[in-house]
């Protein structure tokens, strides 16, 4: 399944707020999940499916990419769900978004694809690049790019940057301090349901 490029409002009406996809928050429609005993199995599947879709649309990844992340998380030591979230949160496009350099993850991905982002002084044009502690992230020295970033930073600094990241507004440089903990995730999600959804595939 390819990356979603359709109307974003339609997605958040169905799944709820997804700040990585869009900063819009329209009225949500009431859930139509049937809670009767006869449909319990179907309802539980749908709940897991929707949690999985939240991750996919929020981080802007394909079905195959998400499945690969689940497989990596399963092989690592620790909580599979928490490790899965850490893998997604440490993607370069997401780190740029969480630093406040862009209003959405698709916007961050565009900066990376257009070779505007430096990691430790080197151009990185792979949005899925996995950031690690002590990585420095900044914009390439281009007036247009810097103007866009400065405008975004000024607006989004009112939102608290998570503790695992730091942004130096004078140097216009972000720093990954450490691997984030569960409390720093910028999305309301039940990752255990996602792991359960993939239990037969990963």
Curated annotation (Swiss-Prot):
Q: Which GO terms describe its molecular function?
A: rRNA binding; structural constituent of ribosome
Listed A to Z, the keywords are: Chloroplast, Plastid, Ribonucleoprotein, Ribosomal protein, RNA-binding, rRNA-binding
Q: Which GO terms describe its cellular component?
A: chloroplast; small ribosomal subunit
User: Which PANTHER family does this one have?
Assistant: 30S 40S RIBOSOMAL PROTEIN, SMALL RIBOSOMAL SUBUNIT PROTEIN US4M
HAMAP family on file:
Ribosomal_uS4_B
Give the family this protein belongs to, as stated in its UniProt record.
Answer: Belongs to the universal ribosomal protein uS4 family.
What is this protein for, i.e. what is its function? One of the primary rRNA binding proteins, it binds directly to 16S rRNA where it nucleates assembly of the body of the 30S subunit. With S5 and S12 plays an important role in translational accuracy.
Matches recorded under InterPro entries:
Ribosomal_uS4, Ribosomal_uS4_bac-type, Ribosomal_uS4_CS, Ribosomal_uS4_N, S4_RNA-bd, S4_RNA-bd_sf
Q: Which organism is it from?
A: Hypopterygium didictyon
What broad class describes the main subcellular location of this protein? plastid
**UniProt name for this protein:** Small ribosomal subunit protein uS4c
Query: Where do the S4 RNA-binding domain residues begin and end?
Result: 90-153
